[in-house]
């Protein structure tokens, strides 16, 4: 009998495994070193133990085929973003996730794909028949919470691109819409609800919506919800969501093919209230950090116009500051023919005056969004800015998070934000999807409460720190820590 030849373990094979870049290897050839390099390439770090390897391509994920076809063929999302690469495998494995990533990094798809996969894997009989019955029609299978109407509408619009093709009903529950509209939109069954916290609590108390079958919860921009005073509303909503014990003591675990409730949370920062929610509600979450989230944004050039003693931190209109603003806009419009500018102010009155004064100076293509504008006017303004019919959007912080407008070329802080986190969120409107962005911030001594955080942010992020900030008295009282 002839002896079997041993499997080849030549030097060439070993060299291929050790020296070839991960992009030239099949999935089963990936080594621990390859995965480390892959994570470094995409700026992915994690903690929490047993973190699944990131996604290299859409085809390597366990995504239902009809959903995968929509992602790649219909919507043409050809490559996952870093947050999608990191979060989707973890969530598909029914792991709770805390994602810390910049706004504009592709978070929406990072939580929509696992949620839709979960719904599509639900028992077919329940999905096609029982869910539409009287006892279940108003009980969504997934809930997405967002801090603002604008972000909720944006998420709804993205989710409906999938829902319309999959036969799933996605409904938004936000202020500015009548309760009767919600009742009408869920009459034949609702699969996903996208809501702001306050409005959802009202709808739950009125029994318009029930969360008895909602074992999949997503909180987007959770830190922003806390900053806006929604912590109590969040706690109330969480009390309506069924527990893992409830899941396992009923037939629901067989219907939904899960062993635990699933929660995905996305945030730009981890504050004590966020840690409290994570500890009390999430189950052994995996923490994902993308691209040094929370550090200075490398792709945004940050400029500061220091104005010395307090000149413009109130509702009074500062004409000298405005003259500088006009010069900045004029220069930017000369350098960039396809410019889009967002100007932030802290007061509604200042926003309205900015709009009028800019119009007098020839910039008629501007729109305003703030809390006193009706929902219809806000939506119209955002649509006009997104389509480039209007080149300048003037806003209070109601627009600082979540409004996804591609190719914003410049952000101007006419007034520095009162909270430092809001500064990061504001300038994060520009420089999205890897593009270069630029920001200008007017700042004076009335803003000194944020100077220490600003100095730390710039120093830790490797940015040039202005001399006036280094030498300012308010930044001398605390030693910067790495």
Swiss-Prot record:
Keywords: ATP-binding, Cytoplasm, Helicase, Hydrolase, mRNA processing, mRNA splicing, Nucleotide-binding, Nucleus. A motif (DEAD box) lies at residues 220-223. It is found in: Cytoplasm; Nucleus. Residues 321-473 form the Helicase C-terminal domain. ATP binds at residues 101-108. SUPFAM superfamilies: P-loop containing nucleoside triphosphate hydrolases (SSF52540). It comes from the Eukaryota. It is an enzyme of class 3 (hydrolase). GO terms for molecular function: ATP binding; ATP hydrolysis activity; nucleic acid binding; RNA helicase activity. Residues 88-288 form the Helicase ATP-binding domain. ATP-dependent RNA helicase involved in mRNA splicing. May destabilize the U1/5'-splice site duplex to permit an effective competition for the 5'-splice site by the U6 snRNA, resulting in the switch between U1 and U6 at the 5'-splice site. May also act to unwind the U4/U6 base-pairing interaction in the U4/U6/U5 snRNP, facilitating the first covalent step of splicing. Belongs to the DEAD box helicase family. DDX23/PRP28 subfamily. It catalyses: ATP + H2O = ADP + phosphate + H(+). InterPro entries: DEAD/DEAH_box_helicase_dom, Helicase_ATP-bd, Helicase_C-like, P-loop_NTPase, RNA-helicase_DEAD-box_CS, RNA_helicase_DEAD_Q_motif. One of its GO terms (biological process) is RNA splicing. This is Pre-mRNA-splicing ATP-dependent RNA helicase PRP28.
């Amino acid at each position: 009998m002839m002896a079997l030849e041993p499997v080849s373990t030549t030097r060439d094979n070993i060299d291929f495994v050790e020296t070839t870049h991960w992009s030239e290897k099949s999935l089963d050839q990936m080594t621990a070193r390859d995965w480390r390099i892959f994570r470094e390439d995409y700026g992915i770090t994690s903690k929490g133990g047993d973190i699944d390897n990131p996604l290299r391509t859409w085809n390597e994920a366990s995504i239902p085929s009809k959903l995968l076809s929509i992602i790649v063929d219909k919507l043409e999302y050809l490559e996952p973003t870093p947050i999608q690469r990191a979060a989707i495998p973890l969530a598909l494995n029914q792991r709770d996730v805390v994602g810390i990533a910049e706004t504009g990094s592709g978070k929406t798809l990072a939580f929509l794909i696992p949620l839709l996969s979960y719904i599509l894997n639900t028992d077919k009989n329940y999905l096609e028949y029982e869910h539409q019955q009287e006892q279940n029609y108003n009980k969504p299978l997934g809930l997405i919470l967002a801090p603002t109407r604008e972000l909720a509408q944006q998420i709804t619009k993205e989710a409906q691109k999938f829902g319309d093709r999959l036969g799933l009903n996605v409904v938004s529950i936000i202020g500015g819409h009548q309760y009767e509209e919600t009742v009408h939109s869920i009459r034949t069954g609702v699969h996903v609800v996208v809501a702001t916290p306050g409005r959802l609590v009202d709808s739950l108390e009125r029994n318009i919506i029930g969360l008895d079958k909602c074992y999949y919860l997503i909180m987007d921009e959770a830190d922003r919800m806390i900053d806006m005073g929604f912590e109590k509303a969040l706690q109330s909503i969480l009390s309506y969501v069924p527990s893992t014990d409830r899941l396992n003591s009923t037939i629901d675990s067989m219907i939904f093919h899960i062993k635990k409730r699933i929660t995905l949370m996305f945030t730009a920062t981890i504050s004590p209230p966020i840690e409290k929610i994570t500890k009390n509600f999430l189950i052994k979450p995996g923490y994902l950090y993308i691209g040094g989230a929370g550090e200075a944004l490398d792709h945004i050039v940050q400029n500061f116009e220091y104005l010395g003693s307090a000149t413009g931190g109130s509702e009074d209109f500062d004409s000298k500051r405005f003259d500088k603003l006009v010069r900045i806009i004029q220069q930017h419009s000369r350098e960039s023919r396809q410019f889009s500018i967002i100007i932030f102010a802290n007061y509604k009155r200042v926003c309205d005056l900015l709009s009028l004064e800019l119009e007098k100076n020839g910039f008629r293509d501007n729109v305003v969004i703030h809390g006193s504008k009706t929902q219809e006017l806000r939506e119209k303004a955002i649509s006009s800015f997104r389509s480039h019919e209007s080149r300048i959007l003037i806003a209070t912080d109601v627009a600082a998070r979540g409004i996804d407008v591609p190719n914003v070329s410049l952000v101007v802080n006419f007034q520095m934000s009162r909270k430092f986190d809001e500064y990061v969120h504001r300038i994060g409107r520009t420089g999205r999807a890897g593009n270069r962005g630029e920001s200008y911030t007017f700042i004076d001594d009335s803003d000194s409460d944020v100077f220490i955080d600003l100095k730390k942010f710039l120093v830790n992020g490797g940015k040039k720190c202005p001399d006036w900030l280094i030498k300012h008295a308010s930044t001398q009282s605390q030693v910067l820590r790495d």
